[in-house]
């Protein structure tokens, strides 16, 4: 996707209703979800919105590949130890209104942590302090985390890669989101590698 396409995606998200927290997921690994999440967050920030992107892929975190992370404190530290989320913030110096929270230490019980009341409180705190909360998750067909977060957050974007994602898997992922009353606001198509 090019920069203009992320502006288009940003505009579509903005006009999808009262949306603050957005889950970005895919059916499988390697479909481009983290890249879409990172670029969508940048696009919102460049559009003068206060944005935080959160790495909720607690088993295989990858936001460090897109941003310079200058703290070891992450989501797991904040949620498990009831810490102030501000201690986990890293800043992208090139984009004024973009904050980053990485996953933190890999927990032994990622799914339980994702589904906890403490996680819900963490997300709601971020919603109260940012215009947009972009959440990068593990793939839906690998773990149930994205589906659980879809039930908590305002909206979900599902990324798929042309030539790789099977239609049946995409349909299955859509159904998983809808089964928890998740608000699927769009499919993001990534062309073949």
Outline where the language-model segments fall.
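Conserved catalytic-core segment of NTP-binding enzymes
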Residues: 111-193
């Amino acid at each position: 996707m090019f920069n203009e396409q992320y502006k288009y995606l940003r505009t579509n998200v903005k006009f999808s209703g009262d949306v603050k927290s957005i889950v970005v997921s895919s059916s499988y690994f390697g479909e481009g979800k983290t890249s879409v999440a990172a670029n969508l967050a940048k696009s919102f920030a460049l559009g003068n919105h206060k944005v935080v992107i959160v790495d909720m892929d607690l088993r295989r975190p990858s936001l460090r590949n897109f941003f310079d992370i200058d703290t070891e404190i992450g989501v797991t530290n904040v949620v498990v130890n009831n810490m102030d989320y501000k201690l986990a913030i890293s800043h992208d110096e090139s984009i004024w209104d973009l904050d980053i929270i990485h996953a933190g230490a890999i927990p032994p019980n990622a799914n339980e942590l994702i589904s906890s009341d403490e996680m819900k409180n963490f997300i709601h705190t971020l919603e109260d302090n940012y215009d947009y909360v972009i959440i990068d998750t593990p793939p839906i067909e690998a773990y149930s985390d994205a589906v659980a977060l879809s039930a908590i957050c305002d909206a979900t974007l599902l990324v798929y890669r042309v030539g790789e994602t099977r239609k049946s898997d995409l349909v299955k992922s859509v159904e998983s989101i809808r089964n928890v009353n998740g608000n699927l606001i769009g499919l993001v198509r990534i062309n073949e590698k």
